[in-house]
Amino acid sequence: MYETYHSGWIECITGSMFSGKSEELIRRLRRGLYAKQKVVVFKPAIDDRYHKDKIVSHNGNAIEAINISTAAEILKHDLSEVDVIGIDEVQFFENGIVHIAEQLAEKGHRVITAGLDMDFRAQPFEPMPQLMAVSEDVTKLQAVCAVCGASSSRTQRLIDGNPAKIDDPVILVGANESYEPRCRAHHIVAPSNTEKEEM
C-alpha cells in the first residue's frame, strides 16, 4: 500500500470467519507500533467472545482495544495525536461507521478496518459493502472449508450441529461452537419453518 501524503486512507480487511481478519488487523496495528506510531483500536461491545477490552484472534494473538457500543463513540475520543486507528468487527456497527471512517481518513489518519463481508446466508453484511467501496485498499481473505479443505469464502452457522434457517437472526455472536468456514459447494442455509410447511 502506497502512502498518501497529507491525507489519510482506509484499509478494509474482510472475508469469512476463521480467514484471519483479526490476525491481519493485529499484524498491521503492531507494525504501526513498531514504527513508533500512535495507535488506537476500537471494538464493538457486543463482541465479548474472548476479552472485553482486547481484540483477540482465533489463534490467541491480542491487542488492547477500546470497547464501544456505537460508531459515534469513536469521535468522542481525542484522536488528534493518533496516526493509526483500528476498528474490528465492523459488521456489528451501524452504517454510520462508513462516514466516520471517511471523516477520520480526511483528517489524516490511517484507518484499518476488519469485518465479515457476508452473513451466514451468504448475503452482503452491511455496512461492509459500503466500507469496501470507499476504501483505498481492500484485502479479502479466504479460510479453509471444514468439509472438503478447499478455499472458503462463506461462514456456515450451525445450531445444534444443523445449518441455521434463512430467517434466523443475522447477528449471533459466536466462534467455532456456532460457525465454521465453508466453500460455495458445502455452504447450506436451511429453509424457514414457514417454507417447509408450504411444501
UniProtKB/Swiss-Prot annotation:
A Pfam family it matches: TK
GO biological process: DNA biosynthetic process; thymidine metabolic process
Residues holding ATP: 15-22, 88-91
Enzyme kind, highest EC tier: transferase
Keyword Flavoprotein: no
Domain of life: Bacteria
Active site, renumbered: 89
Enzyme nomenclature, EC number: 2.7.1.21
UniProt-listed InterPro entries: P-loop_NTPase, Thymidine_kinase, Thymidine_kinase_CS
Catalytic activity of the protein: thymidine + ATP = dTMP + ADP + H(+)
Main location: cytoplasm
Gene3D superfamilies (UniProt xref): 3.30.60.20, P-loop containing nucleotide triphosphate hydrolases (3.40.50.300)
GO MF: ATP binding; thymidine kinase activity; zinc ion binding
Subcellular location: Cytoplasm
Subunit-level organization: Homotetramer.
Family statement drawn from the similarity comment of this UniProt entry: Belongs to the thymidine kinase family.
Name assigned to this protein: Thymidine kinase
Organism: Staphylococcus saprophyticus subsp. saprophyticus (strain ATCC 15305 / DSM 20229 / NCIMB 8711 / NCTC 7292 / S-41)
